[in-house]
Amino acid sequence: MSNTALTPFVITREFRAPRALLWQVQTQAEHLHHWLSPEGFHTIHANMDFRVGGRYHYGLEGPNGMQMWGLQQFLEIVPERKIVHLQSFSDKDGGLGRHPMAPTWPAYMHVTATYEDSASGGTLYTIAWQPHESDAEGVASFDGARAGMNAGFAGTFAKLDAYLLTLQS
């Protein structure tokens, strides 16, 4: 199924960090575990092969030992400018998994992230998500989750802001 008529979920945020630093903390596994997780979760596995055709496989553990696994498959990389990848839930071995709390969630999300210098010396970061080859039920699940995605990204970006400050102090 094509999702070309679907409005992507887009969020833009200015970070008070140079583009090179923001790129580094988003493309190196040793940085990602400091900030890339929902509130209350921590990273238990991070394996990064950051190149076109490569992937990032990660595991998170949250309250009561709940685990979530994910996989990013890199489609396009323009250093310090753009990353395009397919995002999916996975199992601990890197095979395709399903959203643990939303069984109708699309199997794959097409994600485009861009990085631009801001007038204030920071970085303007924009990320766009949309279902990739999803059925109507998956698209409806995605559309119904926009408020939650806004809240989730706000929390994750707050953690990223704090981490960037520690690196620059």
Model regions and ranges:
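Short beta-edge strand/loop motif at the mouth of beta-sheet-based domains
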Residues: 10, 30-73, 168
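Glycine-rich, low-complexity intrinsically disordered segments
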Residues: 21-25, 94, 159
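Residue-level recognition of conserved beta-strand positions in structured domain cores
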Residues: 60, 87, 127-129
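Generic C-terminal helix-cap and adjacent flexible tail
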Residues: 162-169
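Hydrophobic pocket/interface hotspot
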Residues: 22, 32, 56, 74, ...
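Hydrophobic-ligand binding "helix-grip"
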Residues: 46-50, 57, 64-120, 162
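Beta-strand/loop substructures that line and gate deep hydrophobic ligand-binding cavities in soluble
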Residues: 95-151
